[in-house]
C-alpha cells in the first residue's frame, strides 16, 4: 500500500494578488539624474533598500538601460511608481 505525501506548503509573501503575476516597477536610465540622486530616491521610497543597495540598482539601471526595482501587488506598485516619479526618476509604465 502506498501513501501519498502531503502537498508542499507554499509561503504567501504578499507579492502576488492571486489574479496573476506581480506588478513590476521599472526605472529607466536617463541623462539628467545622478547616481547619488537615483540611489537617494530608491532608498527613500523602497522598503529594505538602503543607499548602498540604491547605488547598486543605479549602476544596473545605467548599464542595462533599465532595472526592475520592486515587484508585488498592484496598489503598492502604483504608490512606489508615483513616489519615484515624484523624485524625478524616469519611469517605465508598470508591467505585469
Kindly label every feature range from the protein language model:
Residues 1-96:
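Terminal domain-initiation and capping elements
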Amino acid at each position: 500500500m502506498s501513501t501519498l505525501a502531503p502537498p508542499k506548503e507554499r509561503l504567501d509573501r504578499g507579492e502576488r494578488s492571486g489574479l496573476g503575476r506581480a506588478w513590476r516597477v521599472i526605472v529607466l536610465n536617463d541623462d539628467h539624474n545622478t547616481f547619488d540622486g537615483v540611489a537617494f530616491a530608491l532608498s527613500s521610497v523602497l522598503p529594505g533598500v538602503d543607499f548602498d543597495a540604491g547605488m547598486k540598482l543605479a549602476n544596473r539601471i545605467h548599464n542595462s538601460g533599465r532595472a526592475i526595482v520592486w515587484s508585488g501587488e498592484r496598489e503598492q506598485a502604483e504608490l512606489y511608481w508615483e513616489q519615484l516619479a515624484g523624485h524625478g526618476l524616469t519611469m517605465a509604465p508598470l508591467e505585469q
